[in-house]
Amino acid sequence: MKQAKFIAIVLLSFIILILFFSCKDEQPEIPDFHADALQIQEEYRPGFAVRKLKHLLIYTYGLCGEYDVDYEIVKAVVGVESHWNTRSLSSANCKGLMQISKDAASDLQSSQADLYNPYVNLTLGVMYLSWLQEKYNGNQKKVLKAYHDGPGRVDRAGILNYRKDTYVNKVLQLAARN
């Protein structure tokens, strides 16, 4: 009986050791926020403080982790939508970094006045992308098409030709570049 317990303890200890050493403690690679901020400044916002861009990027990275949205995709959406201009206003009356419409803001229970606040805008945009990811089962092209054209249009269109969709392709190319 004692020998059986001893063997069981040794085997259990051995299994635990194998599991311990076989599991790699993989940490996600954290982006170089300073390099990203410099790149954004050079491409889109000359004269905009790198420190502020860096802070926005760190905030964005945290949001992406919280809502399980790809950080590079969000950076690309912001680049395509507003060129990182916090005061951007489209002809369709979409506002801020992620070009949030008043309808999307009200759907996400935020006032339209907040849309020029970059932190509110990023939060709403990432939340919206997260919701679209869930709605379209992670189909990134459909998610981006719906972000740009609205989910109603995507749902009515059925099969979409993404090869000809310049918005979707721009965002994906920009995200892949980083």
Predicted feature descriptions by range:
Residues 113-121:
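A short, structured beta-strand-centered segment in the mid-to-C-terminal lobe
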Residues 72-76, 88, 137-146:
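Surface-exposed patches in mature extracellular/periplasmic domains of secreted proteins
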Residues 62, 79, 102, 106, ...:
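Short glycine/serine- and small hydrophobic-enriched flexible loop segments
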Residues 1-12:
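N-terminal Sec-pathway targeting helices
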Residues 29-36, 104-107, 138-178:
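Catalytic and substrate-binding regions of cell-wall glycan-acting enzymes that process beta-1,4-linked
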Residues 91-110, 125, 171:
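Substrate-binding/active-site groove segments that recognize
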Residues 24-84:
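Export/targeting segments at the very N-terminus of extracytoplasmic proteins
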